């Protein structure tokens, strides 16, 4: 197997994983137009090539809050990561820490906070959903604090679950889902043994620690579905801001007015994100939304971005459009599914190499020198 880009990991992951798991990660909402535009819109951004600038000294290092990152990349929160590799959250976190970048743990991870945090030598980030069960939210925040988490990523673009039609076709949901998942596992023996057997318990660790009983896949879907809160408003977040004294990032911003509201709220950062095209189909890609948001709030808080980033070249494009740092989700998940921690390590090395090539050939010697002047044209211009 030749791995030269993140797309190779995607192809290999499709072969290795049971279809219900591959398509759960790979799919988006409705007809998946936004999912596709996240990638194609980034690919349509042309960089301005510059030469003869003595690029012998180059630095990808950047500062974010009180952290130093080896490059402006963090691993995004991805639910059920531990179903893609044995104790997957631990493996991904170790790869990120070894590369000098943050790992963001999902609320709905397989491994609990208490298993992942001690496995790495730098503080991880923790992602939290807005849920009706405020007791769970407080419990999760308290446990994250106790584990040394400094940065909270608060996801606000999921007041209701997205309509992900591909899940019904793949067996993740829909008629005879449990039976279809078992049959798929039987035809993927490598995954079935390594993750299905050796990766137990298949629990949602953060939730079961609070509820006091194991939570399987069906319980996960039911519990979350009943706990998303469509009544949420900025006012409801005030108690979290009072409770959490570390950096707080609001994830799921696609509109400049919402970005301004995040500044008023006192957020330390935002993530320009459409949830990887998994929530509302037909909204702007992150690449299209980012410039206007950067114009509105750049300098008032840190701007992160995700959705559609598949290479180090895409990282450079997002930075040029106004992001300070980017989050990668599917790309690292595919690498994790194929080769575990070593796969994520290799992926991050590929991203760094691709960033270095792009920076040398655009004349940017540091991350701060990647600006809109690095673009021939912006998307849609």
From Swiss-Prot:
Location, primary (coarse class): membrane
Residues at which FMN binds: 106, 127, 155, 251, 306-330
Cofactor: FMN
Superkingdom of the organism of origin: Bacteria
A GO biological-process term: lactate metabolic process
Classification via Pfam families: FMN_dh
PROSITE patterns: FMN_HYDROXY_ACID_DH_1 (PS00557), FMN_HYDROXY_ACID_DH_2 (PS51349)
CC terms in the record's Gene Ontology section: plasma membrane
Domain FMN hydroxy acid dehydrogenase: 1-380
Protein family per UniProt: Belongs to the FMN-dependent alpha-hydroxy acid dehydrogenase family.
Function in brief: Catalyzes the conversion of L-lactate to pyruvate. Is coupled to the respiratory chain.
Subunit relationships: Homotetramer.
Protein name per Swiss-Prot or TrEMBL: L-lactate dehydrogenase
Source organism per UniProt: Pseudomonas putida (strain ATCC 47054 / DSM 6125 / CFBP 8728 / NCIMB 11950 / KT2440)
Gene expressing this chain: lldD
